[in-house]
C-alpha cells in the first residue's frame, strides 16, 4: 500500500483550489459564442478539437494527487449537469469555481464554513424557484431551433436540423445520431422506439468515453424469462456467432453464470453482445415485449407461446438496423415493418376505445406513441474524422438542450438570467438570513455574474463593465457577445433551457459547499505532491 499524504484546514482547501483553478481555466475558454477550442491529444488517432466542457473535464488528470482531488470534484459538477440536462457543463464549472474562490476568501477571514454552506443551500433553493417562475414554454419549432443553435455553439444549421427532426417525430419523439457516409448531414425518419431500460452490465459498452453501446445490424432475442444458466443460451449464441452479427438480449433479467458468459464473450470479441432488462412489469412487460417483436419482426420466447430458449432459432429473432444502449435508455432503429406496426397500432387503438380505466388508457396511449412515433436519425456528415467527432458532440448537446427546453421551458441565455436574479437574491437574503448564513448567500450573489463575465472576456471585452450594464436593464434584456450589443434575448434567440440553468446551479452549489466544508484530504503521496507543497509554503 502506498504512503498517504494528509493535509488539514487551509492547506487542504488550498490543494483542492489548485485543481479547481486548473480545470476551470481549461474549460472556461470555450464558453459563449466567441469561445475558443481546446485540442485534446489522443493516444491513438488524430488529435480531437473540442468546444465541449464535459469532454475537456474528462481528459484532465494531474500529477499531484491532492490537486487532482479538486479536479475530480469539479469534474463531478460537469458530469452531474450533463447527466441531468445534457448541456450547460461549462457554465456549471465556471459558477462552482466562482463560489469556491469567493467562499475561501470569507473562510480565511474567519467565517464559519458550515453556516456558509447552509446559506448557499437556502439561496440556491430560492434561485431554483425563481428560474422556474421566469421560464417560458417552448411553443414552436422556431424556439426549438434557437435553443439548438445556442447549444451547438451558434451553429444555425444544427438548430434548424433539430427543429426539423422534432417536427417529424414530435416534441416527445426520439432523435438518434449516426455517422453518415457523405459530407452532408441529413435527417431521416425510420421505424423505431426507445424505452427506459439500459444495459445490465457496463462491460457491454462499445464506447467507453461516452459509456454507450452501439450495435449495427443486430439480432434481437426477446424473452419474458429470467436467464441464469448459460446452457439455455448456447444454441442461439452459436447460431448468431456464425452470422458475424451482434446480438441484443432483452429479458426479464440476466444473472449469474449467463451474465458472466455473455460479458466474457463480449470482452474476448467472440460475439458482440449486450443484455438489456425488458421494460415494464407483469402483463405490461409482456405487451411491451410483443410491441418490440412486431417492430423488429421477431417473436417473444415465452412459455405462454410454448417457446423455450433452448429451441429458439434465428428465424425467431428480431432484427434492428441499429441499437443504441445507455445506462438508462435503449433505442431501437428497425428495418421497415410498416404493415405489421400499423396493424399493431390499430389493435392498440381498439383497446383504448374498449377500456374504461383512465390508467389503462394512459398506458395504452404511451405504447401507441412509442410504437407509432418512429425515430428521427440524424446522419452526421463531415470532411474529416476530427470534424465528425466535433459535429457529433455539438449535435448531442443540441438534442439534449432542446429536449430539456421542451420539458421545463426557456429563460434568457448567455448568463443573463443569473445576473438579473442576483439583486432579487440579495434582497431576499437580507430579509431571511443573518450572520454567516447571510455571508453564504452573498457568496452566491457575487458568483452569479461569473458566466456572463467569462462570455464577455472570451469575446475580448471587459466583463465587469458589461455585467454592471446588464443589471440596469429589463429581465429579458442581455448582452449579445456575437454582435457586441444589448438585445431582448428572446427576440434575438439567445435562450437557455430552464432545466440546464437549474441543473448547473444546483450542482455547482452542491460541490462548492462540499469544498468549503472540507477540513482534511487524504491522498496517495507522490514526488509532485512534495514539490508542490514545498512551493506553496
From Swiss-Prot:
Q: If you read the UniProt record, what top EC class would you report for this enzyme, in one word?
A: isomerase
The parts of the chain that form a coiled coil are: none
Q: What Enzyme Commission number(s) does the record list for this chain? A: 5.6.1.7
**Gene Ontology biological process terms in this record:** protein refolding
One GO CC annotation, please? cytoplasm
Q: Which CDD domains match?
A: GroEL (cd03344)
- MF terms in GO: ATP binding; ATP-dependent protein folding chaperone; isomerase activity; unfolded protein binding
Q: Which UniProt keywords apply?
A: ATP-binding, Chaperone, Cytoplasm, Isomerase, Nucleotide-binding, Plasmid
Source domain of life is: Bacteria
InterPro entries, sorted: Chaperonin_Cpn60_CS, Cpn60/GroEL, Cpn60/GroEL/TCP-1, GroEL-like_apical_dom_sf, GROEL-like_equatorial_sf, TCP-1-like_intermed_sf
**What family is reported?**
Belongs to the chaperonin (HSP60) family.
Q: What does this protein do?
A: Together with its co-chaperonin GroES, plays an essential role in assisting protein folding. The GroEL-GroES system forms a nano-cage that allows encapsulation of the non-native substrate proteins and provides a physical environment optimized to promote and accelerate protein folding.
Query: Subunit structure of this entry?
Result: Forms a cylinder of 14 subunits composed of two heptameric rings stacked back-to-back. Interacts with the co-chaperonin GroES.
Record's protein name: Chaperonin GroEL 3
- What is the originating organism of this protein? Acaryochloris marina (strain MBIC 11017)
Amino acid at each position: 500500500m502506498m504512503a498517504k499524504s494528509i493535509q488539514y484546514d487551509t492547506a487542504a482547501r488550498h490543494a483542492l483550489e489548485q485543481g479547481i483553478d486548473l480545470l476551470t481555466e481549461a474549460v472556461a475558454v470555450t464558453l459563449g459564442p466567441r469561445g475558443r477550442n481546446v485540442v485534446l491529444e489522443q493516444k491513438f488517432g488524430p488529435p480531437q478539437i473540442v468546444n465541449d466542457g464535459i469532454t475537456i473535464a474528462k481528459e484532465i488528470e494531474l500529477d499531484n494527487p491532492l490537486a487532482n482531488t479538486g479536479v475530480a470534484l469539479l469534474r463531478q459538477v460537469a458530469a452531474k449537469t450533463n447527466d441531468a440536462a445534457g448541456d450547460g457543463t461549462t457554465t456549471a464549472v465556471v459558477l462552482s469555481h466562482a463560489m469556491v474562490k469567493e467562499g475561501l476568501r470569507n473562510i480565511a477571514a474567519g467565517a464559519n464554513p458550515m453556516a456558509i454552506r447552509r446559506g448557499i443551500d437556502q439561496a440556491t433553493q430560492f434561485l431554483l424557484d425563481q428560474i422556474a417562475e421566469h421560464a417560458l414554454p417552448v411553443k414552436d419549432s422556431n424556439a426549438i431551433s434557437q435553443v439548438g443553435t445556442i447549444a451547438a455553439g451558434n451553429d444555425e444549421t444544427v438548430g434548424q436540423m433539430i427543429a426539423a427532426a422534432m417536427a417529424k417525430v414530435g416534441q416527445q419523439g426520439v432523435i438518434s445520431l449516426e455517422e453518415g457516409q457523405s459530407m452532408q448531414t441529413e435527417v431521416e425518419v425510420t421505424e423505431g422506439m426507445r424505452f427506459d431500460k439500459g444495459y445490465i452490465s457496463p462491460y457491454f459498452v462499445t464506447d467507453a468515453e461516452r459509456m454507450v453501446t452501439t450495435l449495427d445490424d443486430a439480432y434481437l432475442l426477446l424473452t419474458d424469462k429470467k436467464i441464469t444458466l448459460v446452457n439455455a443460451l448456447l444454441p442461439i449464441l452459436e447460431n448468431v456467432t456464425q452470422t458475424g452479427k451482434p446480438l441484443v438480449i432483452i429479458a426479464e433479467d440476466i444473472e449469474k453464470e449467463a451474465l458472466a458468459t455473455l460479458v466474457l464473450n463480449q470482452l474476448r470479441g467472440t460475439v458482440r453482445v449486450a443484455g438489456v432488462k425488458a421494460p415494464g412489469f407483469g402483463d405490461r412487460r409482456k405487451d411491451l415485449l410483443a410491441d418490440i417483436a412486431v417492430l423488429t419482426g421477431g417473436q417473444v420466447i415465452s412459455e405462454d407461446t410454448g417457446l423455450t430458449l433452448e429451441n429458439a432459432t434465428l428465424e425467431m429473432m428480431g432484427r434492428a438496423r441499429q441499437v443504441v444502449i445507455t445506462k438508462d435508455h435503449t433505442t431501437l432503429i428497425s428495418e421497415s415493418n410498416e404493415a405489421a406496426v400499423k396493424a399493431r397500432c390499430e389493435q392498440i387503438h381498439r383497446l383504448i376505445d374498449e377500456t374504461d380505466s383512465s390508467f389503462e388508457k394512459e398506458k395504452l396511449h404511451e405504447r401507441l406513441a412509442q410504437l407509432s412515433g418512429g425515430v428521427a436519425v440524424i446522419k452526421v456528415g463531415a470532411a474529416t474524422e476530427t470534424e465528425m467527432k466535433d459535429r457529433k458532440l455539438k449535435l448531442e448537446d443540441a438534442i439534449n438542450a432542446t429536449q430539456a427546453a421542451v420539458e421545463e421551458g426557456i429563460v434568457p441565455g448567455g448568463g443573463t438570467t443569473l445576473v438579473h436574479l442576483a439583486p432579487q437574491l440579495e434582497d431576499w437574503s437580507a430579509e431571511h438570513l443573518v450572520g454567516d448564513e447571510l455571508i453564504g448567500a452573498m457568496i452566491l450573489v457575487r458568483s452569479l455574474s461569473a458566466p456572463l463575465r467569462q462570455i464577455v472576456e472570451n469575446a475580448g471585452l471587459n466583463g465587469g463593465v458589461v455585467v454592471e450594464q446588464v443589471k440596469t436593464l429589463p429581465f429579458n434584456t442581455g448582452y449579445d457577445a456575437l454582435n457586441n450589443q444589448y438585445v431582448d434575448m428572446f427576440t434575438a434567440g439567445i435562450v437557455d433551457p430552464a432545466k440546464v440553468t437549474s441543473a448547473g446551479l444546483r450542482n455547482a452549489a452542491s460541490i462548492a459547499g462540499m469544498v468549503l466544508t472540507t477540513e482534511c484530504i487524504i491522498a496517495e503521496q507522490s514526488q509532485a505532491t512534495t514539490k508542490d507543497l514545498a512551493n506553496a509554503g
